[in-house]
């Protein structure tokens, strides 16, 4: 058996940590191609709104709301307003909010990262904003691919994100515990927070 054939056969096991060191496995599993191996959100990384790579392991021990945002959607005002409110009231209790701009729905997030950051500043956003990404399709960010297939992250009528402001509640261990549709306002999540904070 050639080395390249052997490598192809063993690559999934190596990448998922069956043969690799635990620290190395958690870094490798969250790559663009091997997101299925991840066991928690903490195994991923993403660029923040300023283009700096952020290891999502920094959210270990925190309850997180992860959402796709857009600045020109009919649901923008209510979502930004309520997310800012939730963050203000629960950040000291350990809540973190991760907002990922996305232009896939009605092209309602057309601006640059700098323009998105300026827009969010108008709402006095203090939660974490990330660089613009795709949430559906082959180019979707690996975190979003992973969240959509988790047992409690699956959607109605298929797992694809249907519109702006789909929200995922993530527990302190980095596991998806609930998915909220785009028509559900952020304050709906508040009733579920005491179980996880």
Swiss-Prot record:
Pfam family name, one: GSHPx
| Top-level EC class as recorded in UniProt | oxidoreductase
Phosphoserine PTM sites in chain numbering: 40
EC number assigned by the record: 1.11.1.12, 1.11.1.9
Q: Which InterPro entries match?
A: Glutathione_peroxidase, GPX_AS, GPX_CS, Thioredoxin-like_sf
> What's in the GO CC field?
cytosol; mitochondrion; nuclear envelope; nucleus; protein-containing complex
Return one Gene Ontology term, BP aspect.
lipoxygenase pathway
Q: What's its catalytic activity?
A: a hydroperoxy polyunsaturated fatty acid + 2 glutathione = a hydroxy polyunsaturated fatty acid + glutathione disulfide + H2O; 2 glutathione + H2O2 = glutathione disulfide + 2 H2O; tert-butyl hydroperoxide + 2 glutathione = tert-butanol + glutathione disulfide + H2O; cumene hydroperoxide + 2 glutathione = 2-phenylpropan-2-ol + glutathione disulfide + H2O
Name the keywords, alphabetized: Cytoplasm, Developmental protein, Lipid metabolism, Mitochondrion, Oxidoreductase, Peroxidase, Phosphoprotein, Selenocysteine, Transit peptide
Q: How does it assemble?
A: Monomer. Has a tendency to form higher mass oligomers. Interacts with FUNDC1; this interaction promotes GPX4 recruitment into mitochondria through TOM/TIM complex where it is degraded by mitophagy.
Q: Which family does it belong to?
A: Belongs to the glutathione peroxidase family.
In Swiss-Prot or TrEMBL terms, this protein is called Phospholipid hydroperoxide glutathione peroxidase
Q: From what organism does this protein derive?
A: Bos taurus
Q: What is the lineage of its organism?
A: Eukaryota, Metazoa, Chordata, Craniata, Vertebrata
């Amino acid at each position: 058996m050639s080395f390249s054939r052997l490598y192809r056969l063993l690559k999934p096991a190596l990448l998922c940590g069956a043969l690799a060191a635990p620290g190395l496995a958690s870094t490798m599993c969250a790559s663009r191609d091997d997101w299925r191996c991840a066991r928690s959100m903490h195994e991923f990384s993403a660029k923040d709104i300023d283009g700096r790579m952020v290891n999502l392991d920094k959210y270990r021990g925190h309850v997180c709301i992860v959402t796709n945002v857009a600045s020109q959607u009919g649901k923008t005002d209510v979502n930004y307003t309520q997310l800012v409110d939730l963050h203000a009231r629960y950040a000291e209790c350990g809540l973190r909010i991760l907002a990922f701009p996305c232009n896939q729905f009605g092209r309602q997030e057309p601006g640059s990262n700098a323009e998105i950051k300026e827009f969010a500043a108008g709402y006095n956003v203090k939660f974490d904003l990330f660089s613009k990404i795709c949430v559906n399709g082959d180019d979707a960010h690996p975190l979003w691919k992973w969240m959509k297939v988790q047992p409690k992250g699956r959607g109605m009528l298929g797992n694809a994100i249907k519109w702006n402001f789909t929200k995922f509640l993530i527990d302190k261990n980095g596991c998806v515990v609930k998915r909220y549709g785009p028509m559900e306002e952020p304050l709906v999540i508040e009733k579920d927070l005491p179980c996880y904070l």
